[in-house]
């Protein structure tokens, strides 16, 4: 392989590697309940994201960034769903390092089911 081609490939991989944002988590929410969900809060204990009006049988992807304070210890996420006042703790992060997977969250009338993907 020519040196010029090696340089192009190396530049591509380095730019890809450094452009990856591993400072947050992706969550996919699916409303499987019989009605519209008024609001949802997902938090890591420091930062939170608020989602309004998730309609019946609809899906929404949201991204929670770790920006206010990078945790220096282990922790977990939690979700609150209104108006049902459902709350569930789930997942983990270690020393503020975000896991490499995401979460599917299924919201039902009286329960929350969470799967890693």
Regions found by a protein language model. Give the residues of each.
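Generic structural detector for well-ordered beta-strands
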Residues: 28, 53, 63, 91-93, ...
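Post-signal-peptide N-terminal segment of Sec-exported extracytoplasmic proteins
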Residues: 39-75
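Short, aromatic- and glycine-rich surface loops/edge beta-strands on solvent-exposed regions
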Residues: 75-81
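Asparagine-centered strand-capping/turn motif at beta-strand->loop junctions
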Residues: 27-33
């Amino acid at each position: 392989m020519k040196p010029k081609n090696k340089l192009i490939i190396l530049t591509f991989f380095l730019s890809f590697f450094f452009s990856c944002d591993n400072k947050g988590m992706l969550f996919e929410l699916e409303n499987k309940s019989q009605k519209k969900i008024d609001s949802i809060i997902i938090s890591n204990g420091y930062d939170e994201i608020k989602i309004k009006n998730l309609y019946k049988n609809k899906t929404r992807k949201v991204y929670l960034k770790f920006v206010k304070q990078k945790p220096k210890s282990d922790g977990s996420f939690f979700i609150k769903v209104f108006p049902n006042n459902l709350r569930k703790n789930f997942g983990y992060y270690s020393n503020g390092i975000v896991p490499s997977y995401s979460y599917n969250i299924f919201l039902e009338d009286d329960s929350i089911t969470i799967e890693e993907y």
